[in-house]
């Protein structure tokens, strides 16, 4: 790798704090390094990188690598922000004959969702995990059947349900049994996707809350793995989300390109950046409109959606559709941007800038918005840090 590698300072600190713990290290790109460590040191290493070296846990996932190294693997991907910015991934191998590894969650609470998911999908048990409830799999899914193992099951048939009742337990950590319970969902008029929330209340005060998601989990990862080729997955990743599909397909194509050493032309990279910005515009305007709706300011909701229409028109001009689907390919972009299309897009962007500024000024001068937002829902910085928020 000809370019200077980033992350050297973190590796030096890691070797100094934990001598002999790192088994292997290697760069995937100039700013992305992976270290394989001894599994019993996992909680201490992640805690050290997270709190002392300024890392943020972006994602963690498992992988069935028995055909590669004879073991499963778990990856903790961290965005290092304190000094030199880079991605540092901590990898451990897990023995398939004893699929256990020490949980990081007691030391870094942000790991709880990822470790629950790894247990659901791979059957790898994080020993010491405080929350052992299922995360992704439904209550009637058979025990000892782990969907993302390579030899798991025949996916042409759904396994027979093991129960006809809901067994999931919602937890009220901060309250008591005397609290009233207000259920919201799984289907609710304000929800864009199914999600079941339980609010534990004492009078008008919400004491605690718990929730359950993944009601419409589609198994896209296994679908891509078992039924699609590399290029077909690009179109599937576009449809991970109805709002931010191009971001997902860019993440997928970039990963494949980095792994295979494919150099993407500069013009294709610029077109990707433009389409990502178009997607960001319509996504942010959508959520600003919804924020107005949630506080009872429906005039703002309608105005933001009116302005958002221009971003949808941008997408149609540049891609042929009102969403940025189907443009990404491994190695580049499916079609170029024409000069006249770019001129129209610039004109729309200039008008949107003026319209959005007017709407922001209107919001900031509306007393009801101020009353329902200023000082509301403040999250303690320490809790935010623990949760990688």
Where are the regions a protein language model picked out?
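Terminal low-complexity/charged segments
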Residues: 1-205, 365, 369-372
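Catalytic cofactor-binding cores of redox enzymes
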Residues: 112, 133, 137-205, 209-389
């Amino acid at each position: 790798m000809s370019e200077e590698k980033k992350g050297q300072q973190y590796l030096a600190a890691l070797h100094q704090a934990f001598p002999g713990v790192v088994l292997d290290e290697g760069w995937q790109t100039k700013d992305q390094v992976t270290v394989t460590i001894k599994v019993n040191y996992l909680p201490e290493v992640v805690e050290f990188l997270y709190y002392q070296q300024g890392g943020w846990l972006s994602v963690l996932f498992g992988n069935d690598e028995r055909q590669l190294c004879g073991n499963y693997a778990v990856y903790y991907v961290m965005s290092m922000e304190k000094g030199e910015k880079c991605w540092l991934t901590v990898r451990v191998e897990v023995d398939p004959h004893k699929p256990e590894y020490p949980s990081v969650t007691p030391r870094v609470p942000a790991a709880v969702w990822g470790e629950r998911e790894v247990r659901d999908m791979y059957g790898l048990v994080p020993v010491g995990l405080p929350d052992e409830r299922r995360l992704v799999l439904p209550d009637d899914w058979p025990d000892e059947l782990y969907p993302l193992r390579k030899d798991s099951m025949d996916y042409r048939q759904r396994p027979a349900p093991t129960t006809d009742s809901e067994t999931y337990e919602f937890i009220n950590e901060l309250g008591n049994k005397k609290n009233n319970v207000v259920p919201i969902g799984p289907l609710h008029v304000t929800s864009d996707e199914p999600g079941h929330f339980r609010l534990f209340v004492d009078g008008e005060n919400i004491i605690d809350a718990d929730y359950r998601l993944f009601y419409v989990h589609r198994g896209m990862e296994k679908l891509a793995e078992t039924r699609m080729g590399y290029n077909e997955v690009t179109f599937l990743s576009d449809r991970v989300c109805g709002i931010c599909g191009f971001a997902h397909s860019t993440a997928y194509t970039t990963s494949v390109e980095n792994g295979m050493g494919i150099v993407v032309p500069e013009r294709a990279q610029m077109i990707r950046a433009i389409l990502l910005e178009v997607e960001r515009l319509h996504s942010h305007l959508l959520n600003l409109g919804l924020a107005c709706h949630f506080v009872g300011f429906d005039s703002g909701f309608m105005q933001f959606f009116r302005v958002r229409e221009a971003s949808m028109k941008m997408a149609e001009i540049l891609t042929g559709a009102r969403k940025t689907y189907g443009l990404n390919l491994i190695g580049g972009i499916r079609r170029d941007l024409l000069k006249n299309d770019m001129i129209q897009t610039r004109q729309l962007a200039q008008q949107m800038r003026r319209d959005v500024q007017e709407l922001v000024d209107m919001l900031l001068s509306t007393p009801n918005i101020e009353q329902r937002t200023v000082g509301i829902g403040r999250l303690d910085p320490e809790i935010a840090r623990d949760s990688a928020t």
